[in-house]
């Protein structure tokens, strides 16, 4: 056996003709273009989904803020809700809200160039909050966040810059459309970050205030006229489908016929008969369901 080592063999790359090379180039070009197209489509779909999720979150937060504001104006509740307190507590002490003489809340006000999410108008006794101040105009710009743990991400930084620019423009536009008057109003722009899932207020950022002299009630009328959104608490219930409107449980759960069920029970307990007067809309939409429900309750009451 010889001690000489065999020489290493060189591996020659396989050769292919020009036609095969062109076929490979064409295939790679098609694959890369398909991948880019899919990536572009996925980006557009994600952008649309994020936009739709933000719109839904805005709508839900509008209803919550509206409900808490209505509780503030009622005589039953002496303290505002959590979101209301966390936002407007940055502007003034919450005890001041108990002495409000007027309160207006409008959503999505169309100011031509800008469209602030929410504008709150507070009418106060003079010198209660600040010297010479008759009212406060709070401009809210909402930014929804899917992930609420870290507020220093690049996307939230972009949201912060965009929101600040929107608030500054809205502040100047309100100063331009404000009519002449004798009320000293303080404009307070505020940027609010809201969790998309739980609707909790994550962070509130207050910008520089501005004092204007205008008429409070006329300014409220102008802003209410320019609003493109009307808060309706009655829209919080889901619309019942035709195939499941015949059960009392679903009627109760939706809250659509709770008052009618209570009145019906009281009437049956007294007269042992089931009679209900429906409006035209109830006859057209829920007449059959209500008649079936009346028959069921009448049978339950007649049992020994």
Swiss-Prot record:
Localization in the cell = Host cytoplasm; Host nucleus; Host Golgi apparatus
Give me any GO biological process, just one: symbiont-mediated arrest of host cell cycle during G2/M transition
**Recorded GO CC terms:** host cell Golgi apparatus; host cell nucleus
* UniProt keyword terms in alphabetical order: Host cytoplasm, Host G2/M cell cycle arrest by virus, Host Golgi apparatus, Host nucleus, Host-virus interaction, Modulation of host cell cycle by virus
Q: Which family does it belong to?
A: Belongs to the HHV-1 UL24 protein family.
What job does this protein perform?
Answer: May play a role in the dispersal of host nucleolin from the nucleolus throughout the nucleus leading to a decrease in ribosome biogenesis.
According to UniProt, the name of this protein is Protein UL24 homolog
Origin organism is Gallid herpesvirus 2 (strain Chicken/Md5/ATCC VR-987) (GaHV-2)
């Amino acid at each position: 056996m010889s001690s000489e080592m065999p020489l290493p063999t060189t591996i020659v790359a396989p050769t292919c003709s020009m036609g095969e090379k062109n076929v490979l180039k064409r295939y790679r070009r098609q694959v890369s273009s398909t991948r880019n197209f899919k990536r572009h489509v996925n980006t557009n779909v994600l952008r649309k989904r994020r936009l739709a999720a933000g719109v839904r979150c805005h709508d839900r937060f509008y209803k919550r803020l509206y409900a808490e504001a209505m509780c503030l104006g009622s005589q039953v509740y002496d303290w505002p809700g959590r979101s209301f307190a966390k936002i407007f507590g940055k502007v003034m002490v919450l005890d001041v809200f108990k002495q409000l003489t007027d309160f207006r809340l409008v959503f999505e006000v169309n100011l031509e160039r800008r469209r602030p999410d929410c504008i709150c108008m507070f009418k106060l006794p003079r010198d209660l909050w600040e010297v010479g101040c008759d009212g406060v105009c709070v401009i809210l710009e909402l930014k929804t966040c899917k992930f609420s743990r870290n507020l220093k991400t690049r996307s939230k930084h972009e949201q912060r810059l965009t929101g600040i620019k929107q608030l500054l423009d809205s502040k100047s536009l309100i100063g331009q459309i404000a009519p002449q008057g004798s009320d000293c109003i303080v404009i307070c722009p505020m940027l609010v970050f809201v969790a998309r899932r739980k609707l909790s207020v994550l962070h509130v950022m207050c910008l520089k205030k501005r004092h204007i002299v205008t008429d409070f009630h006329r300014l409220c009328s102008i802003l209410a006229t320019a609003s493109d959104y009307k808060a309706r608490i009655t829209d919080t219930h889901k619309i019942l489908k035709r195939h499941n409107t015949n059960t009392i449980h679903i009627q109760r759960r939706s809250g659509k016929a709770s008052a009618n069920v209570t009145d019906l029970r009281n009437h049956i307990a007294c007269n042992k008969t089931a009679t209900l007067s429906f409006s035209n809309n109830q006859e057209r939409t829920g007449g059959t369901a209500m008649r079936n429900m009346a028959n069921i309750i009448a049978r339950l009451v007649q049992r020994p």
